[in-house]
């Protein structure tokens, strides 16, 4: 009896609303523009000036790398031109006439940020920088879905007409991370380099990836700097329940881009997880049913309270407890009558349906009713025993 009373009191002690943890405060960011996204679903978890026109510096090389990987033969030998060998800025010290495999050029460009390697890639793929830039911009628009990016060189040295946004860079990086070769090079910490004039070991410039700024989960990254762009940084990280991409642009000091990145990653993996819309699921709404169109679609869920609804146009929207749309997925109307209850799947466990206050209150009332029935039965039994004694 005491146990039953304790259960009822416990149920009535729940506060109104979902008992899940509240979303923590958004990160404080010093850099002029920043964004953190779910690398798999693309959902924007936090953004600051994400659509503002910015200069990327060497983050440009992410675009050059994935373009080269997808459009070139990585085993091809590229001939280093005089102009490539004389490219200013960070280099891997290529010499005019040197023959270098395309993959090695991509490695030298991403790991050691070699501008000479980037120039050689562009000339090898498209003959000259002008043709390369035209083809690269078309590729970025058509393949990666970038809308506010225009590049005029392969390395990111300043040009007024060479610009992008934090949102586009995150979208680009997420696209590139789907490629295994890109992920391998992007996550390389050190690499033995044997060249015509330079035998050494090259190291990533990304301090979190290298371990100089310790931080759990970092799997890849790229640094950037020119006077006009200031410090820029791209970072990928992986945790049990989510993979993240963080971009920070235009910070005065290196410590700021790393602190901002840590804050973005902390916020992302503490508050969100990646789930999956199964190809077999059917979503009912206003007398219609919708499906994913036969595909398994990654989707991002807040770890605290969230709401899901389907709009009149068939978009599944996930909103956090403040009503902000975390992700919107276009569904396909299903003409069949079968309706299957939808439930998101996560890597850890299925997402639990929320009961809410009234659900808990109903359960409590049900148990309270049982308690009354048991109590009445016990009282009647005691009364019968007393009558027998008399």
List each language-model region with its residue ranges.
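Active-site-adjacent loops and short helices of periplasmic peptidoglycan-processing enzymes
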Residues: 19-184
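Hydrophobic alpha-helical membrane context
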Residues: 14-15, 73, 272
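Bacterial N-terminal signal peptides
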Residues: 7-14
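Positively charged n-region of N-terminal signal peptides that target proteins for export
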Residues: 1-4
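Domain-terminus/edge residues, biased toward the C-terminal soluble/receptor-binding domains
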Residues: 146, 158-163, 167-390
